[in-house]
Every structure is written in C-alpha cells, then in structure tokens.
UniProtKB/Swiss-Prot annotation:
Subcellular location, principal: membrane
Alphabetic keyword roster: Cell membrane, Membrane, Plasmid, Protein transport, Translocation, Transmembrane, Transmembrane helix, Transport
Pfam families associated with the record: SecY
Any one of the GO BP annotations: intracellular protein transmembrane transport
Gene transcribed to yield this protein: secY1
TM helices/strands, residue ranges: 18-38, 67-87, 115-135, 150-170, 178-198, 215-235, 268-288, 312-332, 365-385, 392-412
Protein name (Swiss-Prot/TrEMBL): Protein translocase subunit SecY 1
Compartment annotation: Cell membrane
Function summary: The central subunit of the protein translocation channel SecYEG. Consists of two halves formed by TMs 1-5 and 6-10. These two domains form a lateral gate at the front which open onto the bilayer between TMs 2 and 7, and are clamped together by SecE at the back. The channel is closed by both a pore ring composed of hydrophobic SecY resides and a short helix (helix 2A) on the extracellular side of the membrane which forms a plug. The plug probably moves laterally to allow the channel to open. The ring and the pore may move independently.
Family: Belongs to the SecY/SEC61-alpha family.
Keyword Nucleus in record: no
InterPro entries, A to Z: SecY, SecY/SEC61-alpha, SecY_CS, SecY_dom_sf
Amino acid sequence: MFSTLKNAFKDKEIRNKIYFTLFILLLYRIGANITVPGINVKAITQVAQTGLVPMLDTVSGGGLDNYSIFSLGVSPYITAQIVIQLLQMDIVPTLVEWGKQGEVGRRKTNQVTRYLTLVVAFVQSIGITLGFNALTQMGLVKNQTPQTYVEIAIIMTAGTMLLTWLGDEITDKGLGNGVSVIIFAGIIARLPSGLYQIYKEEIINNSASDRWQGILFFIAVIVAILIVTQLVTWVEQADRRIPIQYTRRATISGSESFLPLKVNVSGVIPVIFASSFIVTPATILMAFQRTQGDQQWFKVMNQIFSLQTTPGVIIYTLLIILFTFFYAFVQVNPEKLAENLQKQGAYIPSVWPGKDTQDYVSKMLIKLSTVGSIFLGLVALLPQLATNFWNLPSSIGLGGTSLLIVIGVVLELSRQINGLLMKREYVGFIR
C-alpha cells in the first residue's frame, strides 16, 4: 500500500488526482463544522449519542453531531439511487428504457435521481429537525416558526446537493467513487473520538479496582478491529476465476485466460444502501415523536427502524443480504457479459455460448453472493447485537459497518491507483 502511494506521487496525473480529492475532502470537513443558522448547538449534545445520530453520521458522512450544513450528508442521494434502481427493474418502462440507452440514458437517470434527492433531503430535513427539537424539550430551534423550519430545511437540502456535486467531482476528476470517499472521510474523522469514547468509559471512568478489566476490554476491541480488518480484506480480495477460451486465436504464450468474479461482487454498496434504508424512515418518524410518540403504530415502526432493538438489527442484516444479491446483478449483468463473450469469440469450457453462459454466470453470482452476503451481514450484525445486549458504546455497535466501508473504499482506491500506474507503464512501453 505504501509503495503504491510512493509510486503514485511520482506520476503527475495521479498526484493531481490525489491532491484534488484531498482538496474536496477539506472543503467537506470545513462545511461539516459550519452549524446551520438558528440552531442551538448546546441542545444537540443531548441527543448526540442516541442510536440515530451515529448511524446517520456513518451512512451519510455528514456532521450531525453539531447540526452542520452537511448534516444529512449524501444519505438522501443514496436513498434516491435505491428507489431509482428498484424502479428500473421492469417496474417503470421509461426508466427501464433509459437503462438500455447507454450514456444518454444514464444522464437522464442521473437527472431524475437529483430531483428525487431534493425531495428526500427536504423531507428528511423537516423530519429530523422536528424530531430532535422534540427530543431536546423544544430547545434545538431558537425561533420555532414554520418559516424557520423551512429555512433550515432549505439550507440542509442545499448542503446535501452541494455535497453530492462534490462527490461527483471526486468521481470525475479525483480518485474513487465520490459518495463512498465522502462517507469514508466522515468515518475516519470520527475514529479518534470513537476510540477515546471507549477508552474514557472503560478505563478513565472505571474505579481503580475495575480498571484492569477496562484495559483488557480496550485491548480486546483493538485486537478485534485488527482481526476483522484482516478478514474483510481477505474476503474483499477473494475471487472465483472462471476459465475462458477463445475460438478465433491460439494462446501462444500458453497462459490461460480467466473471468474473475469477486466473492463480494457488490463491495460496500449493500452496507451503505441498507444503512440508508433504515435511517431515512427513522428521520421522518422523528417528526411525529412529540405528537404520536405514545401511539401503537409509532412504537412498532420505531422498533423496526432502530438499530437499538433486536428486530431493527435483524431487518438491517436482512437488508444487507438482499442488497448484496440485488447489486451483484447490477455490477455484473450476466446477459451483457454472455453477449460480450460471444462477440469476442470467447466461451466457458463445457458451457454453450449465449443463454447457457448467461445462466451459468447467474448461478455463479448467486453462489458467490450467498457467501459474501452472509459475511457482510455477520460483520455488521454481531457488534450491534453485542452493543444492545451489553450496553456498550454506540461506536462499537457501528464498528462493523464502519470497518466494511473504510476497508472497501481503501481497497478500491488502491486498485484504481494500481490500474493507473499500470496504464502509465503500458503507454510508456508502447512509446
């Protein structure tokens, strides 16, 4: 990894991409510390450690702990993406048609996603402001008028749209997927405070007689992080190599060709999607906290969309598994893959080209996604269950989710840099 970075900084184009990405992240971190006007910052500390705030911060990359202009982060954009991609599955004919139009269709889809992001962000802004205001005994918003709530929602929505645009700029001119990189940066920024929270609760606040137990627990947390990091890295890099043969040429070198399919084809996207799927309804529910908090329907919905309850954690895990299968077929389209192999005169041994190849790849994706989804689900589930059962700090509960995102983004950045370096070497060799 370090040698890759060293070589990357020697190349001017890659170096500029790194600097551009860091510059955008600097702008993001500055915005994450600018509090929305009209908000009582002291009041937000009362709810800063509730289950929703750390979760929303994790999935959005925002700065909800100080109610910044980037409080919602990219969460509304992720929610909009989920909705649009689901509607493209033979539900809305227009969206399905756009999916087949290549770059032109992609631009149209992105435009609709932006419009939907505006709506989701505005609704979430109203919901979360009303909810947090109720939780802080009406102390969050200084001037509690409808106009003030609308103004706050407009500012937070504008922050989301700006952050989404910055993410697109990273994707186009920097390194990695912009949205994932922003979420990654938010998690990294909170990492020191998360570790300090564990250190404070388990060591500093413990009595002298129990302090050794806190020290052992803190060491155990560090060891667990290292072990999970290694496991996630191994699974993220593991792949199934399907042998490929060509009818139109002979392999002079004697080397075999492979079609590599990752064990976790979807990467960290299922975790981000599942988190957003839980957080979005939870933020909207907060708007009804004060008026409907005692109603049965509210209690049921609050159980479902909360990671502090066992049903909520189970649903969250099932969503990760579901999105893993769904996004695997988005990342690798068996029909297009079979078509491209046939055009190149390539085939899988013992498998007929065309429909048989498509079915074979689909079955392989299902098998790989089964392993990948169970692994992702367990990494996200176990720390959260431990937190709920033993009343551990919330940073531990979200540790699995955070690790999955951080490691996934780091590996993706490493792969992209290596790809750019190989491209430079290849171009230099041709010249």
